[in-house]
């Protein structure tokens, strides 16, 4: 199981991560994404569909997320198995949006 970080910690350390949104494009179109995140759907992440792009991220800390956390955790696990350093946002994009609401009040 991948290490999890809170949405608050992810927001504070956002510039120190490569953010990967593992949701499908239609989910992002409907709900938005974290500014600066790269979209690599979980299926492509697992099937090596974008391995060249991923290889450029070796040595960097990757932070994955989905809407609620489940797919983000799977994505981080897969990346860690492949030799990357990856964590996931506990609660996913939903937690991120909630954290952003707290900070804009």
Each language-model region and where it sits:
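Rhodanese-like catalytic fold shared by cysteine-dependent sulfurtransferases
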Residues: 1-18, 25-61, 70-105
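Aromatic-flanked redox-active Cys/Sec active sites in thiol-based oxidoreductases
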Residues: 67
